[in-house]
Amino acid sequence: MACLLETPIRMSVLSEVTASSRHYVDRLFDPDPQKVLQGVIDMKNAVIGNNKQKANLIVLGAVPRLLYLLQQETSSTELKTECAVVLGSLAMGTENNVKSLLDCHIIPALLQGLLSPDLKFIEACLRCLRTIFTSPVTPEELLYTDATVIPHLMALLSRSRYTQEYICQIFSHCCKGPDHQTILFNHGAVQNIAHLLTSLSYKVRMQALKCFSVLAFENPQVSMTLVNVLVDGELLPQIFVKMLQRDKPIEMQLTSAKCLTYMCRAGAIRTDDNCIVLKTLPCLVRMCSKERLLEERVEGAETLAYLIEPDVELQRIASITDHLIAMLADYFKYPSSVSAITDIKRLDHDLKHAHELRQAAFKLYASLGANDEDIRKKIIETENMMDRIVTGLSESSVKVRLAAVRCLHSLSRSVQQLRTSFQDHAVWKPLMKVLQNAPDEILVVASSMLCNLLLEFSPSKEPILESGAVELLCGLTQSENPALRVNGIWALMNMAFQAEQKIKADILRSLSTEQLFRLLSDSDLNVLMKTLGLLRNLLSTRPHIDKIMSTHGKQIMQAVTLILEGEHNIEVKEQTLCILANIADGTTAKDLIMTNDDILQKIKYYMGHSHVKLQLAAMFCISNLIWNEEEGSQERQDKLRDMGIVDILHKLSQSPDSNLCDKAKMALQQYLA
């Protein structure tokens, strides 16, 4: 049975294969079972903490032989158990070791071992499985390939504290996404794991807690179930609250806070519940203090960011808890030159992971500033904050760049900040640089923020236009990613609002009529709505309306007709009728409507529609067409009277809707004048 390494065996590795390593493997083939057992035990002692020895034994083919012995019916239970222990030890080496074990199909062999009646052997197999499944190179799907595995693991939970610890650890590492959550939930994970929270073993309690955090994440079904689970007469949320008290280990506090956070975000616990406001939120803020380890501060800040993200009241409470906004500023000064860390290993680790702190701080600032103007002001006034965010936009880590862009996007929702801090720091410059070349996930947020910077009151609008934004945004509208198409067209819509004719002409030229009409037939509703919004903004002010309609009138009227005939919702049709109303406001452009009987019939149809919004939009078209003070109004009024429009106006003047009634009466006044 061959067992191949994914990476080629280098000569240097082979030269290091010692005679003693070969001797260990040779003993596995001894005809005397006792000698084989002793050989495996000696191998176990030789590989503990010795990665070089582990690599040597794998290269020499120890794994296939150990797996063969583990699966042989003639092997004693003691031998099988020792084989599982050695395999587990080999798995605790490098990621390459784990890959080699996976190549030899170790997982099916170990899962088969779980069917044994012997508890010690089962525990050894589970320990090895735990080590393999917690490795980043192991695909989680391998746990779910055989449908009998999960129910069997559930049954083994009652065997011992070790089976409980290892199985919960396997579940928490292999539960990635809703499909896995559903499988575990349907096989009774909640009921089977809940009572483990009161286990005498800390490790079991901890692994059970981790299980619940991954099961509840973004899962309303699991979260709603957890709220009502009783363990020894106590509800699960109450148990979680006890586990996040200050006297509990930090790991337990953090994981309990995550469970309650995920249940809250999934809608199972109210955001104003005391267990969130008075327990979970303060616990997570505590985790952000500089007394905590780097990974605790990262996890605390990221979990808190997730908890408060949709709720303005929680954002306000968090912002005034333990000086959180100032506390987060320390995330950017770590480790300091006079660091109190005396452990060199810890210092080396933290230097390598300091970017995770910056990422977490940006995420939490983004959540804190999502809604409240005062909080945004406090964040921006925190020492050098805008400089730090701008620096974050050019960091090498994609995750930090994404978090920095999200933070800026959150702060850019403030009219005041767009006019002041964003202008003072010329934020648009690094943002435009980010938009030139970034992964889609960053582009989506950066382009969304650009939409805010292009609002008409933003001082950044002019310099952004001068730096080639039109071409960049028109390029985004051709993206395969619908979110990028939406943002590209949205930003162009903002750019066109009350813009000069030159800017509007630039947009139309860069976008091209072909692309504009492709967007008008886009399957994504948001893209269609924003494209209609762009068209509406382009067709505003009479000279602009007449100019654009003189060059693009035929295509625009064609697009309007198609949308009004299509299966679109009320909002789409309302926006389209508003575009027609704008065209009807042009001096020469209105002729394109008056000479198009098909369009006139559609306007008439929508005047009698059951939905008031559409009736009002159609009324705007009619009002603009019949306005007395404009040249040719008499001919237009006569034509519309012949179509029966005046009769409809009389009916609408009796409408119970006051707005519609007033508009109809005003239109009738034009006929009487």
Swiss-Prot record:
Family matches, as Gene3D superfamilies: Leucine-rich Repeat Variant (1.25.10.10)
Keyword field: Acetylation, Cytoplasm, Nucleus, Phosphoprotein, Repeat
Positions where N-acetylalanine occurs in the chain: 2
Source organism superkingdom: Eukaryota
Gene Ontology BP annotations: proteasome-mediated ubiquitin-dependent protein catabolic process
Gene Ontology terms: cellular component: cytoplasm; cytosol; extracellular region; GID complex; intracellular membrane-bounded organelle; nucleoplasm; nucleus; specific granule lumen
Residue(s) carrying Phosphoserine: 337, 512
InterPro entries: ARM-like, ARM-type_fold, Armadillo, ARMC8/Vid28
Per-repeat ranges for ARM: 51-92, 95-134, 138-176, 178-217, 224-265, 269-309, 313-352, 374-413, 416-455, 458-497, 501-540, 543-585, 588-627, 634-673
Cellular compartment(s): Nucleus; Cytoplasm
Subunit relationships: Identified in the CTLH complex that contains GID4, RANBP9 and/or RANBP10, MKLN1, MAEA, RMND5A (or alternatively its paralog RMND5B), GID8, ARMC8, WDR26 and YPEL5. Within this complex, MAEA, RMND5A (or alternatively its paralog RMND5B), GID8, WDR26, and RANBP9 and/or RANBP10 form the catalytic core, while GID4, MKLN1, ARMC8 and YPEL5 have ancillary roles.
Cited function: Component of the CTLH E3 ubiquitin-protein ligase complex that selectively accepts ubiquitin from UBE2H and mediates ubiquitination and subsequent proteasomal degradation of the transcription factor HBP1.
Protein name, UniProt field: Armadillo repeat-containing protein 8
Gene: ARMC8
